[in-house]
């Protein structure tokens, strides 16, 4: 049984790391399709708001937050249950216009020390070419004690959500998906196709994921 099939059958868990304007809509969209979803954020006040039915991002709306089945948590150990992890933390820009990778590095450290063998980690955060391979993968390997490509897989799907845009939503924007090999690409594409109504655009060139 593929990971996609396990997620559909609720025999696997999907987690979203970073519940801001990108991560929150992703978590709610997958939960709406019946998947077991963990929504993780280090900001305890944000988690409290979501649990109370409030949406500080304004991207989903209070009603959907109240009705969602997403399991909101600030306890990183909950990520050990996850078979498919979406990293959707922000990548702000420094004063010299270089990307501030602090949130991505922090998220990778958290995921790494709680990574389940066989899991797929997909980065949605906007990063420069080579960042996934040179920065993220070593952190994941160090934290987990596992080897990328053997014990877990990596993918990349750049976020395309424009905050406040009510017309162009996650579901109706075609999404680029890539994986480190054909197997991971196929899984990632099938899983994102669950929520992307207009379909995904698979990129098989390995350089696109690193």
Language-model features and meaning:
Residues 2-13, 32, 36-38, 42-84, ...:
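Conserved N-terminal Rossmann-fold NAD(P) cofactor-binding segment
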């Amino acid at each position: 049984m593929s990971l996609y099939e396990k997620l559909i059958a609720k025999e696997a868990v999907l987690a979203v790391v970073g519940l801001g304007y990108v991560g929150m809509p992703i978590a709610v969209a997958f939960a709406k399709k019946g998947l077991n979803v963990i929504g993780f954020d280090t900001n305890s006040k944000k988690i409290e708001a979501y649990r109370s039915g409030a949406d500080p991002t304004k991207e989903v709306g209070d009603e959907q937050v109240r009705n969602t089945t997403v399991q909101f948590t600030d306890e990183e150990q909950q990520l050990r249950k996850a078979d498919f992890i979406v990293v959707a933390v922000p990548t702000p820009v420094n004063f010299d216009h270089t990307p501030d990778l602090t949130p991505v590095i922090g998220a990778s450290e958290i995921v790494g020390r709680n990574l389940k063998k066989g899991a797929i980690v997909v980065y949605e955060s906007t990063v420069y070419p080579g960042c996934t391979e040179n920065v993220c993968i070593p952190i994941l390997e160090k934290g987990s004690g596992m080897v990328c490509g053997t014990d877990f897989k990596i993918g990349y799907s750049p976020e395309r959500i424009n905050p406040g845009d009510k017309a162009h939503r996650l579901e109706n924007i075609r999404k680029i998906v890539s994986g480190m090999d054909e197997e991971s690409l196929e899984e990632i594409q099938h899983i994102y196709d669950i929520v992307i109504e207009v379909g995904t655009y698979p990129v098989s060139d390995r350089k696109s994921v690193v």
